[in-house]
UniProtKB/Swiss-Prot annotation:
It comes from Oryza sativa subsp. japonica. One of its GO terms (cellular component) is plasma membrane. Its main location: membrane. The keyword ATP-binding applies. This is ABC transporter G family member 51. May be a general defense protein. Belongs to the ABC transporter superfamily. ABCG family. PDR (TC 3.A.1.205) subfamily. GO terms for molecular function: ABC-type transporter activity; ATP binding; ATP hydrolysis activity. It holds the Pfam family ABC2_membrane. Residues 505-718, 1163-1380 form the ABC transmembrane type-2 domain.
Length: 1441
């Protein structure tokens, strides 16, 4: 069983010995009686019944039959309280640890002689490498993107040799992971830790080259199912945000067979115990039996994992996502761990599971993993970021990696002595883990050199690895690898089947989860249904039956247009299915690759459970539209119409699902999906009737699902008896004439053919969706390798002879360990600034009481988060803001920094004695957020240039600004990676600690006097944290005021601070003031409080401080630390200092600036403009794909409408040409709007951070986003030229330069306003899903009222206003009149005989001489959409705090 971690809560045992002894005797007697009753049960019942003893405190929850007394219960019928009671008994220790439970389970196995299965993992001569670009060639610019495509083609054709450098990630490493021993994996950044874990889990990316052997119990990875044997716990937290923590773990337990594993164990165990007359522990027996039964709702295994991971307090909270509120980052990390360890796998490969956790929580989790390893003889290899000394000591063995080489592997207790033998000693008050991660660093190694009589010479990782191989530990390891391995044939340990439970059970689990997700997304589905109703009402009132009559072909064409629009709307209403599918893929891929379930078990519920939704959509549209428009009134035709809509909606959902699963990326799906939809739309039989389709497109016509739907719906309507009137233009009926004129069949059986084909397509698309899920892998973008070889003549230290490099060699300078500018005690850097003191006194902060708490009966209207908080932040003083989770650290920092946009603030906040003015304060303050949010497509240097240009005063020269940026880069050790692309967090670009240093540097280049830092070391390993803290310390030494919130830090990081503000839950201060040398002031203060446990020698003061001030400690001591502090001399000293510093110095005035921002709006605009141009230039997946799609779409259009531009013989020819232009405008415009949304969405998150930092006002930013306008304009211009020139000459419009130019102008303006509309949709909605849904409604209305489906002359007066505000209508008007408005060729058609321009004027309402007005209107639409986007950016914030 692999679910193991530590109970986080601490319970204090109450020692009442006499009462305790008598209670124990009573419980024992009761247990004997219950066990006797149990033994009288038939064998079948004994497997499902267990003895549940009374709660130790007599306050147990009900179990379906009583409270607190012992019972013989059927474990299958236990409710939630009953399960909790069983769990309490199993875990009942003073520490709520799992040691006793696991020891009891192991003892039960030992008692009957059953062995616990064991797995030994070996890897020998393992090398992992890849080929990468370096320097500027690695940047994803448009040129490089095209270059890469051409290069791949030439290489595959053997016409070019690869121009890449070999990067060795793991270099000939060997080792053994023993069962029953906890193994820690340590190493600095980029040392290959994650790659080693992935290699052992058989999860390496297919692009990586691997050599060497990995074996489990001597069996190669291809001889058994690795994923069911081992669990790789990733650094990335991919979860479905709508599910709660409990639901996430329940699903994982069902899929991994957590209960089934217990059943297998119990079968043999119970039989052997019965044979030998062994009576098991009632608590252990009850736990194991309860865990062995699968439950739909209440699962004991899930409750156990929740408890030991400390997630029980948030079990029913949604996990959440980037835009949806959920659990904290640390809790989400524990959910990731729980999801994998809940199953039966006994080999755990755990990759940095402690990110975001305080050291106390990490200790408890690792401690219980240790219990699991030692008792159940499991195999665990765990990498940790900053293991505290007490956590480090829990491990048995250590693997130390550096630059892809193993430099130590062996017992953890010998590692210090080993490095001492190499000449490196551990300093006092230094954690061993921190020492080990720094001793290989070129910059840090010298400080650990023990022999001061000799000069230190740097010992490289390669040299250390060679020395290790020759050491006693290396030879012992080699001997281990040479020996044979047992348990080779253990089928229980090394399963060969892929799935742990029957596939029917997996399908049930997936169905249950999908039902939950549908219920959680009910707003989205309700919104979409209401949208169908809304568009249906508009459609029915537009084609109102009082205005249409089934008497002639002209009216019939309007009926046909209405039917066609209904089909198109139902089809495109499923577009959001593609967005939702793509958003769910990361979680699916994780679970698929871990064999949670097969792909079809995921796709089947997606398909089946959308059937009722399709039915509802069809019913709503049919009921709203059918009789209001006045279609054929017989009931059978109404229900056939509804069936057809249901069929096309099901087909569309399958189509969009399939497109999402194949594309796997929103931009690619939108772009290439649009090309597919374009062909389906054009060849559906309405825009281009069958008789006009070119021979080379006949095949596409016959496979277009829309064609079958168009035929079926047309036959259903026009074969009705009311259309049997003989036409005035021939001997056939009006209905037959309409069908024949549009090349549609007249046989009624085509309805059933259409429905059958649509349903067949639905099945086909869902099968393809399933196959895509099963066989395609996620699109992975490689990390940019951009060392400092760009632009200044420096190289990458690459051996061009062998062309082979390790990570350390390629990134030799990436962490700034060479060539660093010395800046130990700079007094102010290049730019002067004013040192400032911040005082705050009796600060209170309230928010409105959450509705959930009001519903539980809480009477107060406000919830207080900060309570009378007072303190001082001074120049040259580094202050730590510390407290348990929920104590209000970040809240206080946000209040002081002016980042809170809601709530109620009370108290006195002063800057150097003057009242704080937020508009002024924002100019002199920096705020380093916990989340490192940056534009992915810019480099490090560009990020700093952008910040400095916008935030430094405009009177600073460019040269001075450049020198200042250079100095800051040196200060934070980023100068060696100045040309590295920032990239997307966790995917590409900078490492975590490099991003953190960049976040700090972005604030430093603003030359602030006061800097707030929220968790600057969170998510970093010890070495990276040391680099960041060195940066922070250097910043303080320049004379600035710096305050940091921080989790429980290591000793050396904690003691880098000068002062401390310690808070407890409820936002109350329990210590404020100096830390002292070796934290002596703080230690003396707390040890002066009676009965506080004194600190032991060498113990981390930060850990001790937080342990002795917990709520449990307060209860034990009977005191309130906040009250103790308020009555202390320490508090009085702080108060006196606040009073002293709250008085302004004589002759000083409050800070004043002439404007809110450092730069004027024109400068803000130009800087934002340049940044957006860089973002676009380096977004090839957006721009290259878009231009490629435009080329493909142009060729499709040109070939479908080949040479129809000069064909002007009938009204049908004119309408065909109009259809071509209508489809071109609509489809390419919609594609532009859809593909720009992901780009804008990413940059919006960056905007929120930059706007909060007062970099610029919202208008210049939004104006520069027009470069999502102005930057977009060159790309739209190229797009226009590609599409316009190809289609103009292929369609064969009139060879007239004026008409060509006008055609290009209209296309350019159309693409522009569609692009701006896509930005508006993002600006007005909180998520991309919602933007997609809202957009589809607008696209439908623009399609309906564009003047193509229903001419302007036939639009009712109550809707004509919408026609004039429909941008597509103006595009169509402009393009048609520019091409045909002056044509006098005579044409004939139903009800018309005259010239072309007369037809345009009389039937379509297009008048000549409107060219200038039409261009002006289209420009106005572009300006209007841009203005709405600018206003939305300024006024709406979907991340309000």
């Amino acid at each position: 069983m692999a679910f193991a971690a530590g109970g986080i809560d601490h319970h204090v045992a109450v020692d009442v010995e006499g009462e305790e002894e008598s209670r124990r005797r009573a419980v024992a007697e009761e247990a004997d009686l219950l066990w006797a009753a149990f033994e009288r049960l038939p064998s079948a019942k004994r497997r499902s019944h267990a003895v549940v003893l009374p709660d130790p405190d007599g306050l147990g929850g009900g179990d379906g039959g009583g409270r607190g007394e012992g019972q013989l219960v059927d474990v299958r019928k236990l409710d939630r309280p009953g399960l909790q009671r069983v769990l309490r008994h199993a875990l009942a220790t003073s520490e709520l640890d799992n040691a006793n439970l696991l020891h009891g389970i192991k003892a039960r196995f030992d008692a009957v002689g059953l062995e616990v299965p064991r797995v030994e993992v070996r890897f020998q001569n393992l090398t992992v490498s890849t080929d990468v670009h370096v320097g500027r060639r690695a940047l994803p610019t448009l040129v490089n993107y095209v270059h890469d495509i051409a290069e791949r083609i030439l290489i595959s054709s053997h016409l070019l040799r690869p121009d890449k450098h070999k990067l060795v990630i793991l270099d000939d490493v060997s080792g053994v992971i023993k069962p029953g021993r906890m193994t820690l994996l340590l190493g600095p950044p980029a040392s290959g830790k994650s790659t080693l874990l992935l290699a052992l889990a058989d999860k390496l990316d297919s692009q990586l080259k691997k050599s060497g052997e990995v074996a489990y119990n001597g069996m190669a990875l291809d001889q058994f199912c690795v994923q069911r044997t081992s669990a790789y716990i990733s650094q990335t937290d991919n979860h479905i945000g709508e599910l709660t923590v409990r639901e996430t773990l329940d699903f994982a337990a069902k899929c991994q067979g957590a209960s089934e594993n217990w059943q297998e164990c119990l079968k043999e165990l119970v039989n052997l115990e019965k044979e030998r007359g062994i009576r098991p522990s009632p608590e252990i027996d009850a736990f194991m039996k309860t865990a062995s039964f699968r439950r739909e709702k209440h699962n004991l295994v899930s409750d156990y994992v929740l408890r030991v991971l400390g997630l029980d307090i948030c079990a029913d909270t949604p996990v959440g996502s980037d835009m949806e509120r959920g659990v904290s980052g640390g809790q989400k990390k524990r959910v990731t761990t729980g999801e994998m360890i809940i199953g039966p796998r006994k080999t755990l490969l755990m990759d940095e599971i402690s990110t975001g956790l305080d050291s106390s929580t990490t200790f408890q989790i690792v401690n219980c993993m240790r219990n699991f390893v030692h008792e159940m003889e499991a195999t665990v290899l765990m990498s940790l970021l900053q293991p505290a000394p007490e956590t480090f000591e829990l491990f048995d063995d250590l693997i130390l990696l550096s630059e892809g080489k193993i430099i130590y592997q062996g017992p953890i207790k010998h590692v210090v002595d080993y490095f001492k033998s190499l000449g490196f000693s551990l300093p006092p008050r230094k954690g061993i883990a921190d020492f080990l991660q720094e001793v290989t660093s070129k910059k840090d190694q010298a400080q650990y050199w023990s022999d001061q009589s000799k000069q230190h010479i740097f010992v490289s990782a390669s040299e250390m690895a060679a020395v290790f191989k020759e050491s006693q530990y290396g030879t012992y390891l080699e001997a281990n690898l040479s020996s044979s391995c047992g348990n080779k044939d253990s089928a229980l340990v090394l399963p060969r089947s892929k799935f742990a439970v029957p596939k029917f059970s997996l399908v049930r689990a997936c169905f249950a989860r999908e039902l939950i997700l549908i219920s959680r997304n009910r707003f989205l589905y309700t919104f979409r249904t209401c949208q169908v109703a809304f568009v249906g009402i508009i459609t029915s009132t537009l084609f109102l039956r009082t205005r249409l009559h089934p008497v002639d072909e002209q009216n019939g064409n309007l009926y046909l247009a209405c039917l066609f629009f209904g089909l198109v709307h139902m089809m495109f209403n499923g577009f959001t299915e593609m967005t939702m599918t793509i958003s769910r893929l990361p979680v699916f891929y994780k679970q698929r690759d871990n064999f949670f379930h097969p792909a079809w078990a995921f796709s089947l519920p997606n398909w089946i459970l959308r059937i009722p939704y399709s039915f509802i959509e069809a019913v709503v549209w049919s009921c709203v539209v059918y009789y209001t428009v006045g279609f054929a009134p017989t009931v059978d035709r109404f229900f056939r119409f509804m069936l057809l809509l249901f069929s096309i909606h099901q087909m569309a959902l399958g189509l969009f699902r399939m497109m999402g699963a194949i594309a796997r990326d929103m931009t690619i799906a939108s772009t290439f999906g649009s090309a597919v939809l374009l062909a389906i739309f054009l060849l559906g039989g309405f825009v281009v009737p069958k008789g006009f389709i070119k021979p080379w497109w006949d095949w596409a016509y016959w496979i277009s699902p829309l064609m079958y739907a168009q035929r079926a719906v047309s036959v259903n309507e026009f074969s009705a008896s009311r259309w049997s009137k003989v036409s005035v233009s021939g001997n056939m009926t009006v209905g037959t004439n309409i069908l024949i004129s549009h090349s549609l069949p007249t046989d009624d059986h085509w309805f059933w053919i259409g429905v059958g084909v649509l349903l067949a397509y639905s099945i086909f698309f869902n099968i393809m969706f399933t196959l895509a899920l099963a066989f395609l892998n996620p699109l992975r973008k490689p990390q940019s390798m951009v060392p400092s070889d760009a632009g200044d003549g420096r190289d990458v230290h690459i051996n061009t002879d062998s062309n082979k490099n390790t990570i350390g060699e390629i990134f030799e300078n990436n962490d700034g360990f060479e060539g660093q500018t010395e800046c130990k005690s700079k007094k102010g850097m290049i730019l002067p600034f004013q040192p400032l003191t911040m005082t705050f006194h009796n600060v209170n902060y309230y928010v409105n009481m959450p509705k959930e708490m009001q519903a539980k009966g809480v009477p107060e209207k406000r919830l207080q988060l900060l309570s009378e908080v007072s303190g001082i932040f001074r120049p040259r003083v580094l202050t730590a803001l510390v407290g348990a989770s929920g104590s209000g650290k970040t809240t206080l920092m946000d209040v002081l920094a002016g980042r809170k946009t809601g709530g109620y603030i009370e108290g006195d906040i002063r800057i150097s004695g003057h009242k704080k003015e937020q508009r002024t304060f924002a100019r002199i303050a920096g705020y380093v957020e916990q989340n490192d949010i940056h534009s992915p497509q810019v480099t490090v240097e560009e990020s700093l240039w952008f910040s400095s240009t916008l935030r430094l005063p405009n009177d600073i020269s460019r040269e001075t600004r450049h020198a200042f940026v250079e100095e800051v880069m040196a200060l934070v050790e980023l100068d060696q990676i100045r040309y590295a692309l920032v990239g997307k967090q966790g995917l590409t670009g900078l490492s975590t600690e490099q991003r953190k240093r960049l976040t700090i540097a972005v604030e430093l280049v603003a030359n602030p006097s006061i800097i707030f830092m929220d968790e600057p070391t969170s998510g970093l390993d010890a070495r990276a944290a040391a680099i960041v803290m060195r940066t922070v310390r250097n910043t303080v030494d320049t004379g600035r005021t710096v305050v940091c919130t921080i989790h429980q830090p290591s000793i050396d990081i904690f003691e880098a601070f000068d002062e401390l503000l310690l808070m407890k839950r409820g936002g109350r201060v329990i210590y404020g003031g100096s830390l002292g040398v070796n934290s002596v002031d703080m230690i003396n203060y707390f040890q002066g409080i009676p009965r506080v446990v004194p600190i032991t020698e060498g113990y981390n003061p930060a850990t001790w401080m937080l342990e002795v001030t917990t709520q449990a400690s307060e209860e034990r001591l009977g005191i309130d630390f906040a009250t103790v502090y308020k009555n202390s001399y320490q508090f009085r000293n702080v108060e006196n200092l606040i009073v002293e510093l709250s008085i302004p110095a004589s002759g000083t005035e409050p800070l004043k600036f002439s404007s809110e921002f450092s730069q004027n709006r024109l400068t803000q605009f130009m800087v934002c403009l340049r940044k957006q141009s860089l973002v676009y230039w380096r977004s090839p997946e957006y721009n290259v794909v878009r231009l490629f799609f435009t080329s493909v779409a142009a060729i499709i259009f040109g070939s479908i409408f080949w040479n129809v531009g000069m064909k002007r013989e009938s009204t049908e020819d004119i309408l065909l040409l109009m259809g071509a232009l209508y489809a071109a405008c609509l489809f390419l415009g919609v594609n532009n709007a859809s593909s720009v949304q992901p780009v804008v969405s990413v940059e919006r998150t960056v905007y929120y951070r930059e706007r909060a930092a007062n970099m610029y006002s919202s208008f210049p930013y939004a104006a520069a986003q027009v470069y999502h306008g102005l930057v977009e304009i060159p790309y739209i211009a190229v797009q226009t030229l590609i599409f316009g020139l190809i289609t103009y000459f292929m369609v064969n419009y009139e060879r007239n330069i004026r008409k060509l130019v006008l055609y290009l102008i209209y296309m350019f303006l159309t693409f522009t306003y569609f692009t701006f509309y896509g930005m508006v949709a993002v600006g007005l909605t909180p998520t991309q899903h919602m933007a997609s849904v809202v957009s589809s409604a607008f696209y439908s209305l623009w399609n309906l009222l564009s003047g193509f489906l229903i001419p302007q002359s036939r639009i009712p007066g109550w809707w004509i206003w919408f026609y004039y505000i429909c941008p597509v209508a103006w595009t169509l008007r402009g393009v048609i009149t520019s091409q045909l408005g002056d044509v006098d060729t005579r044409i004939v058609g139903p009800g018309f005989d005259g010239t072309v321009h007369e037809f345009l004027q009389q039937n379509l309402g297009f008048e000549q001489g409107m060219t200038g007005a039409t261009v002006a209107v289209l420009v106005a639409f572009s300006v209007f959409f841009f203005s709405i986007y600018a206003i939305s950016i300024k006024m709406i914030n979907f991340q309000r705090s």
